[in-house]
A protein has these predicted regions:
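Nucleotide/phosphate-binding sheet-loop regions of phosphoryl- and nucleotidyl-transfer enzymes
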Residues: 1-171
Length: 171
């Protein structure tokens, strides 16, 4: 019975789109088997896992930890390119047309790409994912876009933000 959570800002005043969020935290190779058993829907689970890898690699690994890809393109764009390659190879136009097996394969492609491009493996450990996501949300308080938004909206810097960790609800 895996516990998946979202990690979001709990700023005193809402700052729409300014603060980072990470969804599906806690989904690992081990926990996804329990989620497949619980939902009976492997495609849903593999899609949630690949989305976590993409979001985490971008928000936590690249942005928060400051790891920059050597070739210039951000990790999110590179992972989206891998998705496009797979859709083309399978002769489909939409993400939803990929099968559970396609998405399972894409997860491994994503993990390999993250390791190659960022030089660090995607954490297949729920606690590491959680602490990384929490740090990223706190860090997003001081991004250029968040600081600029606070200036425009007269939100004091010293207010800071909280981090909300909430159980994921799908439906």
């Amino acid at each position: 019975n895996p516990l998946l959570v979202s990690v979001r800002s709990g700023a005193r005043k809402s700052m729409p789109g300014m603060m980072d969020t990470v969804l599906n935290v806690g989904l690992t190779t081990k926990t996804r088997e329990g989620l497949i058993e619980k939902t009976g829907n492997p495609r849903f689970v593999y899609d949630a896992h690949r989305r976590l890898i993409q979001m985490y690699a971008d928000v936590v690994m690249e942005q928060e930890q400051g790891i920059r890809p050597a070739d210039g393109d951000g990790i999110r764009e590179q992972l989206e390119a891998e998705m496009s390659k797979m859709k083309k190879a399978r002769g489909v136009e939409n993400d939803v047309d990929l099968t559970a097996d396609d998405l399972k394969e894409l997860i491994e492609i994503y993990k390999n790409k993250v390791k190659k491009v960022l030089g660090v493996a995607f954490p297949d450990d729920a606690k590491k994912q959680l602490w990384g996501a929490i740090a990223a949300v706190f860090h997003s308080w001081n991004t250029k876009r968040a600081v600029a938004y606070r200036r425009i909206e007269n939100i004091p810097d010293e207010w800071g933000t909280a981090v909300n960790v909430q159980t994921m609800v799908f439906g």
